[in-house]
Amino acid sequence: MPFTLGQRWISDTESELGLGTVVAVDARTVTLLFPSTGENRLYARSDSPVTRVMFNPGDTITSHDGWQMQVEEVKEENGLLTYIGTRLDTEESGVALREVFLDSKLVFSKPQDRLFAGQIDRMDRFALRYRARKYSSEQFRMPYSGLRGQRTSLIPHQLNIAHDVGRRHAPRVLLADEVGLGKTIEAGMILHQQLLSGAAERVLIIVPETLQHQWLVEMLRRFNLRFALFDDERYAEAQHDAYNPFDTEQLVICSLDFARRSKQRLEHLCEAEWDLLVVDEAHHLVWSEDAPSREYQAIEQLAEHVPGVLLLTATPEQLGMESHFARLRLLDPNRFHDFAQFVEEQKNYRPVADAVAMLLAGNKLSNDELNMLGEMIGEQDIEPLLQAANSDSEDAQSARQELVSMLMDRHGTSRVLFRNTRNGVKGFPKRELHTIKLPLPTQYQTAIKVSGIMGARKSAEDRARDMLYPERIYQEFEGDNATWWNFDPRVEWLMGYLTSHRSQKVLVICAKAATALQLEQVLREREGIRAAVFHEGMSIIERDRAAAWFAEEDTGAQVLLCSEIGSEGRNFQFASHMVMFDLPFNPDLLEQRIGRLDRIGQAHDIQIHVPYLEKTAQSVLVRWYHEGLDAFEHTCPTGRTIYDSVYNDLINYLASPDQTEGFDDLIKNCREQHEALKAQLEQGRDRLLEIHSNGGEKAQALAESIEEQDDDTNLIAFAMNLLDIIGINQDDRGDNMIVLTPSDHMLVPDFPGLSEDGITITFDREVALAREDAQFITWEHPLIRNGLDLILSGDTGSSTISLLKNKALPVGTLLVELIYVVEAQAPKQLQLNRFLPPTPVRMLLDKNGNNLAAQVEFETFNRQLNAVNRHTGSKLVNAVQQDVHAILQLGEAQIEKSARALIDAARNEADEKLSAELSRLEALRAVNPNIRDDELTAIESNRQQVMESLDQAGWRLDALRLIVVTHQ
């Protein structure tokens, strides 16, 4: 290998050193100085792992002074090169630059430059890069993108709402499903879609203080969305980092109280340029035309500044008409400005609901009914569709569905309001109550008496709360170490129940964390019962581990002991037995407890066991909940209303449980009120809205389609290959779970989403739902997305050499495999990937420019090839460099036709879809005022920008592989 002082070479094994200069040569060795790092390397002359850097006419090079030059001619004299060309900054021509003055920080980014500079990748990395390009492009084109990656059951009505709303520009909707139907999940799905597609980047979630942690957990566990929780302390800290503290995070959760307490804070929130605002428990925002509450005004102010708004609320019937109108007014104050007009409009929807019911019933329609439908829809050329719907043909059902969709598009608040009821959704279990009346121990009786004397000045509410938890009254006098569990009959009953039901998973809920911890100790020490604890003092990871231990079938915990707050947001539908060691103070909390098990997908009836002490507030409350509200065995939408109406009386009975006079009458009155309110709610149900929200067969098909995609084996093979190449250790744990841990030889020292301790993953949705410690891996999971980004944003796998052993071809035959990418640059919010994601075009060219890609499939061809080490590869490249240059030019001449075809197809699809959506909404705007002007403007603007971006689309060479035929 001829070396001359001043020549420039690059290391094949340490390309990060940059461009080296030959500074010493003797008979056996050569020394290179790498100026960009200041390091020297000594190599054997005969077999050194370095490649001569030689540029060609047309290349752009940089001098050590920083100016650039386009090479037009290359001269060699005494082994040293001089480049002649035109400077790009001054446009001076005929400039000469000797190679010794080349910039030492040279980085080869183009695949062909890397190949000619000896930066040759392993063959498996090239294959991974091509697969990453191919799968990434396919995923953008898959239907239901953004709906597949969440750790949730595939429940049709939830998917239907999320699919509809998640694709809109800046959606402003009211989610008003009944309790237990998953409003939080629906909101999370919508957020996930909007964030994944780029339609939104900044999200603010405002919730009651007690639900902050629940939302934090749900967003992270189900959707892999890491929100920051802002309270007074975090807000004060962030003020050091930015003028507006909320600019320090993209995804934020805070409480309603935190938002409204300070004028400056609310101003900062309004100025933070959020894309989406989510408000949970929005029915607590009190409004009247004359006196809106401060909370309502705070959200109203925010809703004016944030383009997208999701309000999660109780059902409209529970709210009452005026309160329901107030929520809609937050979404669109221009449309909902007059309450009286709104009431009148609602009455007019009855005939539409009747028409929809008539179509869904499937009966033949009379001429009058057909005419009425025609008038309601108000479309020209509707006659053939009406005739098809009324015929006996196979198309009748689909024609009726289309008519139903048209009716719902044109009438009612179905674009802004979604509401599902348990009546309309299948899959809920029964609930069976078992009450166990137990005697009040003398120790508690004494403590209660003393407490009554000493706490005479306490309010009735404080006394009532004390009376619910006699063990705490006892501890107040005897100290925290008082062993109340030695005589409390509930503990004896619980141990007996658990030992006689050892095969059952049992969820035990109590109000306080201390109670849960003490019970765990007693169960473990006395009976050897495996019990996990779950309370608010534990970190999210500790709670995950406890939940995972409880979920394990054979070796897991039999019991999970939860505190009230600690269990928020967690669901354990694999268990069906629940013990309430004490009772919560209001019906909402009771429903929240039962809701841990009473979910869609629960396979068994729920057994609710309530051991209670007689002559305590527990005995009062158990009767009131069961006999007055029927709140144990059925969901109780009336609970809060009745609770508020009898609050003072109920508190007095709880504070003095031995004073039972009149209590039977209270229960009777509550039951009558409950039945009357329930009938009223049932009567006020908006059937039209239910049909729209539920999604029917369309929603079912959506769930089935995603279920099919869950079985994609390509994902598993690709993910394992990706993790191998990144350098992540994989340990099969069984039960469809794999443990991933970082290694010492990773492509990057710190891979996003992989902690030092490692993570457990699964590709199985059912396993992920049962095991909260296992992350559910899909194409949408950050682990895969970060991996794709790591490979595709760098040059990993962009140039390689392979040998093809094939005696049918002459030795030394050259083939060049080219991977071009056709793409368009545009802001993420345009969601251009719907039409033209970065799309790979593969070409396999011989020296005559014949493209063999169609005849030779990638994976089949890849299996026939053998790898070449980098040093041998560099020698091969140097030997055939001119031939490869010629083939590359042939490739450049051919790619334009293929790329143009892709770009034209994308333009046609974008124009057709976006124009059709705009036309549809413009036509509907004439008959349905719930379509906002700003939505139409945004779609038109989006269409124009998308078309302009596609006009600017281009292509580039992303990767290449040189293939040399051998017979050995």
Curated annotation (Swiss-Prot):
Residues 164-334 form the Helicase ATP-binding domain. It is an enzyme of class 3 (hydrolase). It holds the Pfam family Tudor_1_RapA. GO terms for biological process: regulation of DNA-templated transcription. A motif (DEAH box) lies at residues 280-283. One of its GO terms (molecular function) is helicase activity. Residues 490-662 form the Helicase C-terminal domain. CDD domains: DEXDc_RapA, SF2_C_SNF. Belongs to the SNF2/RAD54 helicase family. RapA subfamily. This is RNA polymerase-associated protein RapA. It comes from Shigella boydii serotype 18 (strain CDC 3083-94 / BS512). The lineage of its organism: Bacteria, Pseudomonadati, Pseudomonadota, Gammaproteobacteria, Enterobacterales. The gene is rapA.
